């Protein structure tokens, strides 16, 4: 490369396929070259006007490709005269919290739950996750690439971010609040596996470590693999635990199971967390369970497009203009706290980034407070059960074309799902195509923002019906696509 080569990020996106999804930049590892990651980091520095001699925190998940990407981002920061605070392997919310508390931007290297052959980069300003406006500015940025190495050795690890994160929970939850509980951790390749164990032991729990692996396993908390469904039930019989805790790869999405090894739906975990914390106002995507409104727990509920930036945007209007306690959560279980809270033990700082640890602690604490098992917590909620799954390797443009056709032609909906669900009442195109039927059944199709997948969410009066709706709807729409 010659000196001072200019690169347009928009053109780089098109040529590489590495682009912004629902949260952060995602793409194939083979396309995320040192040069590309260097360029994206310069665009981030340029968009946020990060001055030389500033500090930027970098952390990463446990994907094999993450250290190389982190090194390229560090090289770009060094070229721009910016100091890297390298936090090494750390949960995304821990990186975000540390950056926010220290008023510095942050970069998280993670592909979250997406397939093994992909990875990503999430960017944070000193105020939290960057907005869609920031993303648009980065997407049109023109950066000047120098004649330097696009990857340099990472600096020494700074452990402060981990301690900041642990202290957030220790300040709010009383010591020994989990005493007497047997809690299992499905460790797999979660970046939070050791941190969660340390936290639970410190709060008095007896901890059982299960399923640790050195190979990276992409866990999708909205489409839990059948092997993990069966594994949790087997472990429950063997180990007699009160709950089983896990997360996706970068620990911003919880995976919480009850004493029977039944994984709880993420939006139900979010609802129960908000109940425990005494939240007044909830922002949540259109795909989440309608039990949120039907429960009557909250003064206000706002529905958004899918993706944490949209949830954060909805939360911000309350945070700026209302004294209400504000939070948000998604169908994946990631919980965002918009208001600082206080308990008898101490304060819980706000964190407007998806978090997996808070919701798991809150739901377990709620069950202990009510002197019941986790499986009993949902029995007081309105009978609205949900399910979700996906068709992988399904091009996004195909998904969009099919959904546009269904939305434009009501007879197509009747042909596709009429004998399964009956007559439809209305459609919602806030994000994808959400079809509500007069029977009360809901089927929601949406292209994933992070990978070439078509997702399906369903809601019904019982779990078997919701599971059937998802399985049958995906089978039918796949056939519909090829006819």
Where are these regions (language model features)?
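Phosphate-binding chemistry for phosphorylated carbohydrates and sugar-nucleotides
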Residues: 9, 162-373
